[in-house]
């Protein structure tokens, strides 16, 4: 998930001769890619909860219901199908109790800014956490090192680069 990045930034009609998609272009042409997508809310964190947990109650992660697993959680669906579930985020783990809450909802791991900083000491801190580059490095490393018969991976990422202040 790319916070605040409209897909128009990936289209030649918008960018002209500058191909911002780069190596992603081949995936845009061959993978499952939704060109028309509306957020569930006008806030990234609220939309995130709606998409991953399938609830409109966006404050649930720090409410009295925070420890109740929901059958509608996307991660639980993938876990039941045998996947290892991982959430990688350059933001801080404690934001709205996301780290602990997403684990309750079926994510095996929640990797946030603190874990990324420990793994990638060159990562600089920002007001929202770290740098998205290291989210992608972590995912790439996971995919490169993944071998059978290990369970397949379901990895969700959330970027923060486009969040003000830039």
Placement of each model-derived feature along the sequence:
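Solvent-exposed soluble domains appended to multi-pass membrane proteins
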Residues: 1-166
């Amino acid at each position: 998930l790319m916070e605040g990045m409209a897909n128009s930034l990936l289209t030649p009609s918008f960018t002209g001769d500058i191909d911002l998609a780069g190596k992603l272009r081949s995936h845009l042409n061959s993978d499952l890619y939704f060109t028309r997508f509306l957020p569930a809310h006008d806030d990234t964190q609220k939309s995130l909860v709606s998409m991953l947990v399938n609830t409109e109650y966006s404050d649930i992660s720090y409410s009295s219901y925070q420890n109740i697993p929901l059958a509608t959680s996307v991660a639980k669906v993938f876990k039941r199908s045998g996947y290892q579930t991982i959430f990688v985020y350059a933001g801080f783990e404690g934001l709205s109790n996301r780290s602990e809450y997403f684990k309750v909802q079926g994510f095996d791991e929640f990797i946030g800014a603190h874990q990324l900083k420990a793994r990638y000491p060159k990562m600089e801190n920002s007001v929202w956490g770290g740098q998205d580059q290291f989210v992608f490095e972590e995912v790439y490393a996971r995919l490169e090192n993944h071998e059978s018969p290990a369970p397949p991976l379901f990895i969700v990422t959330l970027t923060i680069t486009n969040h003000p202040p830039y």
